[in-house]
Amino acid sequence: MMAVTVSGNTGQSTAERLQCEFFLVKKKRQCGMTRRAGSQFCSEHSTDSDRVPCPLDPSHTVCLSKMRVHMRKCNKFRHDVSYQAKQREIPWFKEGLNSISNGKSDSKPADETLVKSVSLIQKIFQNEFGDEPPLPLIEKQNELLERTERYKTLVNRKHARQQSSLIQHLKESKLWPSLESCAVNKTLEYIELGCGRAEFSRYVNIATNLDQKEHSHEKPEYKAVAPSFTLIDRASQRLRFDNKFSSDIGTEVQIRREKIDIKDLRLDAVLHDASQYVAISKHLCGVATDLSLRCLLNSDKCKANLRGILIAMCCRHVCQSSEYVNQEYIKGLLKRQTDGSMAYSEFFQCLKKFCSYCTCGLRPDMDPNSGSEDHITKLTHNERQRIGHMARRIIDEGRAQFLQSKGFETVLFKYTDSAVTLEDTALLALRKHD
């Protein structure tokens, strides 16, 4: 930044505010900060040798003698979860434990690469899935949950409908606490990754309690035991539902929430001592799905006692080629193409780009068969969306096959109608029985 001083008298009256004389060229005005008497510039623009760029955010400078104090209150520190964890030396933090990234982020694919990828995606999809119909729509309803007063009074049931379907999938897949398991002290813990306000876990808690009450008259000798919950999110959430869990069902529920990036999470250090674990998430964003799968498989407790995983995935357009959990799968797809001269990272960037067209939607006045003349690929809105669904299926299939290689049975399906949400695909993984 160029410094241009504005002529002025540094010995002006103390009654008058001493304005910094540094001229901000880009903003075409003088700095508005106050300077000390006898100084030409404010502390930010001072040329004193004891000021250095802040280690957390080099866009501002810090006086060396005040560095320790500044590091505790710097705005960047408040948002840097990994740095906070490192400073606190918490046992569940291990930097980069679940990451395999080389530190490089994906770049936008070149126009010619994007155009070239269209035929490649179509060919790969045809070879892998042939004329196989789209993923099946298996929307379910948890009747007990939908009978509750809260559900009935909801005006917008968009999220509640999704939760009801996912919860019923958990129940029918036996990822659920039964009265029999409670009787032999087999405790169940749900791990919600990317939990946000923990609304999904809250309704899992309500539904399991209602189900146990419904069947308790059949087996009065068994006592219902609420599952425990571990909630993970890297952001600070307002209006969290954590304190509602116990009041919703009238009994104490074990809950633990930790603010940490999944890439740095040592899961064993935060889990309760349960007999079995189930990992869940509703709309786990982009690369977080890959980090979560790796996090679960890096856990010794989950290796032995993880019963299953149910993740409603979203935002494939913010996945990372370097973090994708099954790179060998996509490299293998490319290798089998005789005309495949595209590198893995390039192809993955194109997959991400096309995935974004799955969730764009159209304004009511737009023709889905138009838009080809304005787009580099010369594809209409409908055609781009169709290629996007192919790209999304390829990314999701790689994740499913990764879990299969680790001893799980997997299924991909649409858990709700696309009119409810365009991010309508879920991955269910169940531990194979020996």
From Swiss-Prot:
Protein's UniProt name: tRNA:m(4)X modification enzyme TRM13
Pfam families in alphabetical order: TRM13, zf-TRM13_CCCH, zf-U11-48K
Annotated GO biological process: tRNA methylation
Zinc finger CHHC U11-48K-type: from-to: 51-78
GO annotations of cellular component type: cytoplasm; nucleolus
Residues spanning the signal sequence: none
Taxonomic superkingdom: Eukaryota
Keyword Endoplasmic reticulum on entry: no
Catalytic activity: cytidine(4) in tRNA(Pro) + S-adenosyl-L-methionine = 2'-O-methylcytidine(4) in tRNA(Pro) + S-adenosyl-L-homocysteine + H(+); cytidine(4) in tRNA(Gly)(GCC) + S-adenosyl-L-methionine = 2'-O-methylcytidine(4) in tRNA(Gly)(GCC) + S-adenosyl-L-homocysteine + H(+); adenosine(4) in tRNA(His) + S-adenosyl-L-methionine = 2'-O-methyladenosine(4) in tRNA(His) + S-adenosyl-L-homocysteine + H(+)
Protein role: tRNA methylase which 2'-O-methylates cytidine(4) in tRNA(Pro) and tRNA(Gly)(GCC), and adenosine(4) in tRNA(His).
Binding locations of Zn(2+): C54, H60, H70, C74
Record-linked InterPro entries: Methyltransferase_TRM13, Trm13, TRM13/UPF0224_CHHC_Znf_dom, Znf_CCCH-type_TRM13
Membrane spanning stretches: none
Family, per entry: Belongs to the methyltransferase TRM13 family.
Annotated PANTHER family: TRNA:M(4)X MODIFICATION ENZYME TRM13 HOMOLOG
Top EC group: transferase
Keyword vocabulary terms for this entry: Cytoplasm, Metal-binding, Methyltransferase, Nucleus, S-adenosyl-L-methionine, Transferase, tRNA processing, Zinc, Zinc-finger
Keyword set includes tRNA processing: yes
